């Protein structure tokens, strides 16, 4: 018989830097999960990734207080900011452009995020990433 799911907890945690302080501690402590056990498992799973990169994670908490978790790819906005070399997107993306990304960079980001995105082909995923870039005030160059 399958375990009974008590809750799903969605967080963004820096790769390799999970610790019991907020946001991890309160979110998991509320569900009665062993926080240090999660932190060790998460840090072990994300040690190959760039340290500090925000990683979305979905934690499934079961009635017996055990848990499983699934890590996703970093948000497109974070990857675009890194590729363009900017701190943050534009406050007025239709008027102020803050940086540039090439189509090759967009393709690379789309390939990185392919598992977490909908869309049949890499081209449709690239269009989605390019749209995110434009809404952040980045210019997509051919």
UniProtKB/Swiss-Prot annotation:
CDD domains linked: Ribosomal_L11
GO molecular function, one term: structural constituent of ribosome
Maturation and modification: One or more lysine residues are methylated.
Gene Ontology terms: cellular component: cytosolic large ribosomal subunit
RNA-binding found in the keyword field: yes
Superkingdom: Bacteria
RNA-binding recorded as keyword: yes
Keywords tagged on the record: Methylation, Ribonucleoprotein, Ribosomal protein, RNA-binding, rRNA-binding
GO BP field: translation
Family per record: Belongs to the universal ribosomal protein uL11 family.
Record's function text: Forms part of the ribosomal stalk which helps the ribosome interact with GTP-bound translation factors.
NCBIfam families hit by this protein: L11_bact (TIGR01632)
Subunit structure: Part of the ribosomal stalk of the 50S ribosomal subunit. Interacts with L10 and the large rRNA to form the base of the stalk. L10 forms an elongated spine to which L12 dimers bind in a sequential fashion forming a multimeric L10(L12)X complex.
Protein name: Large ribosomal subunit protein uL11
Organism: Mannheimia succiniciproducens (strain KCTC 0769BP / MBEL55E)
Gene: rplK
């Amino acid at each position: 018989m399958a375990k009974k799911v008590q809750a799903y907890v969605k967080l963004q945690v820096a790769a390799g830097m999970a610790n019991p302080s907020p946001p991890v501690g309160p979110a998991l402590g509320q569900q009665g999960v062993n926080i240090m056990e999660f932190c060790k498992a998460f840090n072990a799973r994300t040690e190959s990734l760039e340290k500090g990169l925000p990683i979305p994670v979905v934690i499934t908490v079961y009635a017996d207080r055990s848990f499983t978790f699934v890590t996703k790819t970093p948000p497109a906005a974070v990857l675009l900011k890194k590729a363009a070399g900017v701190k943050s997107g534009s406050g007025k993306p239709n008027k102020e452009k803050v940086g540039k990304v090439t189509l090759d960079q967009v393709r690379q980001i789309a390939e990185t995020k392919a598992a977490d995105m909908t869309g049949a082909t890499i081209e449709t995923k690239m269009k989605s990433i390019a749209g995110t870039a434009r809404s952040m005030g980045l210019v997509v160059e051919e």
